[in-house]
Amino acid sequence: MSQPILVFDSGIGGLSVLAEIRKLLPHHDYCYLFDNARLPYGELEEQELVSGCVALIDQVVERTHAAIVVVACNTASTVVLPALRATLSIPVVGVVPAIKPAAQLSKSKRIGLLATPGTVKRHYTYELISQFADDCHVELFGSSELVLMAEQKIATGQLDMARLTQVLSPIVTADLDVLVLGCTHFPMLRDELQQVLGKGVTLLDSGEAIAKRVKTLLAETKSEQQVQEDANRDSVMQAFYTKAKISEGLVSMLVDCGFSTLERITTINSNR
């Protein structure tokens, strides 16, 4: 494995971002690190979140010699990036909720942000709204349950549509025309979300924008010869997780995604 792109999340949500990056960089090597022992991140205290993420990512970067880190988690990106960038010497890319494109796309100027409770309450989120959606009415919806529902869907192939409809009922009645998916888990539920919310609501996420940023950064750090060498070989994919056990369904899904190696990383926070 040669200087992989390291994609990090609390669970499997970051795979939606990884998929977008692979569309642009199909021959690159990838590591996917998910801290599922501490899932969901939206319920952690800020300092616990920062210290745990920085220690875990630093450990895997040192081991894999990653070329770039993508924090594919909205909750972590709102608080972890400064400390992570101070620790690492390689580029770090975070996730920004797609508030700006949502405001530009909305015709009714009524938009929503669906995210974890942690992202919804961060000052950073309110700054984004003030800066890019000042001319819009913005509704905020926080849910950790949807994160767990996305994880369950991937692990078991099943989703409780009746419960999903209940969770989304405040959004249905909010009369929005654009909804920002402010958690990387939520694109995993895109079809079901669209089914409940109807075709009148456009769903936006940040995956494509992140992929373009990663491609740009790699082009700045690699020579033309290295880029050509990458294009002429098969991609190698490795996954790391922190929980003591993962389900057979999740293992099967990761293998189907192309991961050849799955390994548990032991940390002080991963004894669950």
From Swiss-Prot:
The gene is murI. It comes from Shewanella sp. (strain MR-4). Pfam families: Asp_Glu_race. Provides the (R)-glutamate required for cell wall biosynthesis. Pathway: Cell wall biogenesis; peptidoglycan biosynthesis. Substrate binds at D9, S10, Y41, G42, N74, T75, T184, H185. The active site is at C73 (proton donor/acceptor), C183 (proton donor/acceptor). It is an enzyme of class 5 (isomerase). This is Glutamate racemase. GO terms for biological process: cell wall organization; peptidoglycan biosynthetic process; regulation of cell shape. GO terms for molecular function: glutamate racemase activity.
